[in-house]
């Protein structure tokens, strides 16, 4: 069994507004997905992210830290959340990614986690 991180990227400009029926439908879809992941014993961690404007990037060059508000790349899709799941192999990770609601209209990027 290996752990994988699932990074959910979506178009923030198309994200439903707080309190809208569309957002409630998305919340319901993620709750159903989370229930399925937990029932399978695959869930380790996961949470949504705040809007991209709340994020920041830090880089260090020549010993000097530079902090930039907002997403690292202005035109990039929004990293709106993540899951860490235990999967028996890549095929199972691909199956969970395909079921993730963010993959339907967005992208779920999957990385195996290197255990040290």
Specify the residue positions occupied by each region the protein language model found.
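Conserved, structured core segments of small domains
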Residues: 1-116
């Amino acid at each position: 069994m290996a752990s994988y991180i699932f990074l959910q990227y979506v178009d923030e400009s198309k994200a439903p507004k707080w309190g809208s029926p569309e957002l409630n439908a998305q919340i319901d879809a993620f709750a159903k997905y989370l229930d399925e992941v937990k029932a399978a014993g695959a869930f380790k961690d996961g949470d949504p992210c705040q809007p991209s404007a709340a994020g920041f990037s830090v880089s260090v060059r020549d010993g000097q830290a530079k902090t930039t508000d907002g997403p690292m790349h202005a035109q990039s899709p929004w990293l709106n959340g993540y899951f860490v799941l235990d999967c028996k192999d890549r095929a199972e990770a691909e199956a969970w990614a395909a079921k993730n609601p963010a993959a339907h209209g967005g992208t779920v990027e999957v990385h195996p986690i290197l255990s040290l």
